[in-house]
Amino acid sequence: MDYDKLSKDILQLVGGEENVQRVIHCMTRLRFNLHDNAKADRSQLEQLPGVMGTNISGEQFQIIIGNDVPKVYQAIVRHSNLSDEKSAGSSSQKKNVLSAVFDVISGVFTPILPAIAGAGMIKGLVALAVTFGWMAEKSQVHVILTAVGDGAFYFLPLLLAMSAARKFGSNPYVAAAIAAAILHPDLTALLGAGKPISFIGLPVTAATYSSTVIPILLSIWIASYVEKWIDRFTHASLKLIVVPTFTLLIVVPLTLITVGPLGAILGEYLSSGVNYLFDHAGLVAMILLAGTFSLIIMTGMHYAFVPIMINNIAQNGHDYLLPAMFLANMGQAGASFAVFLRSRNKKFKSLALTTSITALMGITEPAMYGVNMRLKKPFAAALIGGAAGGAFYGMTGVASYIVGGNAGLPSIPVFIGPTFIYAMIGLVIAFAAGTAAAYLLGFEDVPSDGSQQPAVHEGSREIIHSPIKGEVKALSEVKDGVFSAGVMGKGFAIEPEEGEVVSPVRGSVTTIFKTKHAIGITSDQGAEILIHIGLDTVKLEGQWFTAHIKEGDKVAPGDPLVSFDLEQIKAAGYDVITPVIVTNTDQYSFSPVKEIGKVQPKEALLALS
């Protein structure tokens, strides 16, 4: 893949660098905050090689890339003045409260996920080593590795402070100093001593801030306003000293007196609410969550669960949300594996197997967008697989006990605890159910490549022949959303090699546009066919086109319809790819006779039945 070219194309199609406030990436997606989402050309973005799809979550514009997203992101940064350091604070775009919340969660937690994932995996591996007797508990090695695993979680407020400051547009190092203050060992000891505490006569509520999420987020949000307010009234020559000094003096005590305790209470209630739901309706809750989590991933809103997961483990020592994400991923992997088993297209079989393995590793977008959603029924099967695993988890009370990386096999140590065996069984159930459901539901296979054409079905009502010499392509490759999205109907496209268009069927000419760039034919069997020569060629107003027919003429396969000057039109900057559409698509089922490769006029391409 040419990452440099792809990055330049993406920047152009999102409205140019000037339309980008900020760009970050997660494991599979580029996440843009754009000044105006309407300027992004979604249809053309989705046609780019390497782009699996686009999505808008809240106000965030997302481009789904897959495993190569870090390389594409690096290329974007290399070819622009953008980075994840750019503040979104300058946006003039109005956001509703829900959109703003999801945008903040994504922007704050995405940058720190590698640290949390790495530390969580180390915690899991240490627990595994102790369980199997490979490491003595309290040994020097154990103490050091435990510190490595615990460090990111104990000092989580510090990581969040820096990330949140970048998101809120304040100084990340002052934010880190705020977090460091509330985590100071002497202050922690004072807060944990159980004695009344006050600051200049104001009571300080005892609370523990290590490993917490909400208190520091509220604190840095307030700090961003305090810092800007002080900056506004401070002379430029004094800002370096005055702004950070007074920000710390105001925000740290405010955090200890009001913000911190409020955040701690909110976190406790949030955790208690999740636990109550799973304690009293665990079976139903887990079935619904595991069965629909893939839909949540599609919206990109799954990152909204990250702070809840972290908070649950910090408050209670376990979490029920991450297991649901695991099951959804296993369902996607199983459905894609079923496609591998059933498909007769060698290339697509290979893709299905590869994406199934990737989903098992915790990266589901390639399987979801590249295989299961493309074939539709396997995606429904994946949801069934997740729900089946959710039923088992709900009955057995499976939980995760640490925060790990992706919800895939490498992160299995997150389950080390009382329900570990049940967790493994549930993963197998989700994968097997996804596989079985997809296999039994079946799907319309991607036609096999190759020079040998499949036989036309005996029950076919109509055969559509090629109207032009050239190379046949899928409609999805047409750089016009109306055609590529199938809005006009199903069909195929041809990249012409000569400027002669002939009739693809026996029937009557129903329409010939005055610009002669488009012809409508109704076959004797009732198929309504549109041949559209090039894209935007209506602007030529008939120049370089010659019609050989008129409306009402009877035609047979191979009869001349229109001649056009291929080279002149290309030289004028027009794309000459020619969609051939069956506009009354809903009346037929389609069987491609030849889907790719060179074609001659009158060569059978599509069977309608």
Swiss-Prot record:
Keyword Kinase: yes
Keywords: Cell membrane, Kinase, Membrane, Phosphotransferase system, Sugar transport, Transferase, Transmembrane, Transmembrane helix, Transport
Active-site residues, record numbering mapped to chain: 26, 532
Every PTS EIIC type-1 domain range: 103-459
CDD domains in the cross-refs: PTS_IIA_glc, PTS_IIB_glc
Lipid bilayer topology: Multi-pass membrane protein
Enzyme Commission no: 2.7.1.-
InterPro entries associated with the record: Dup_hybrid_motif (IPR011055), Glu_permease_IIB (IPR036878), PTrfase_EIIB_Cys (IPR018113), PTS_EIIA_1_perm (IPR001127), PTS_EIIC (IPR003352), PTS_EIIC_1 (IPR013013), PTS_IIABC_b_glu (IPR011297), PTS_IIB_1 (IPR001996)
Domain PTS EIIA type-1: residue ranges: 480-584
SUPFAM superfamilies: Duplicated hybrid motif, Glucose permease domain IIB
Endoplasmic reticulum in keyword set: no
Entry's free-text remark on domains: The EIIB domain is phosphorylated by phospho-EIIA on a cysteinyl or histidyl residue, depending on the transported sugar. Then, it transfers the phosphoryl group to the sugar substrate concomitantly with the sugar uptake processed by the EIIC domain.
PANTHER family with a match to the protein in the record: PHOSPHOTRANSFERASE SYSTEM TRANSPORT PROTEIN (PTHR30175), PTS SYSTEM ARBUTIN-, CELLOBIOSE-, AND SALICIN-SPECIFIC EIIBC COMPONENT-RELATED (PTHR30175:SF1)
Protein name from the UniProt record: PTS system beta-glucoside-specific EIIBCA component
Source organism of this protein record: Bacillus subtilis (strain 168)
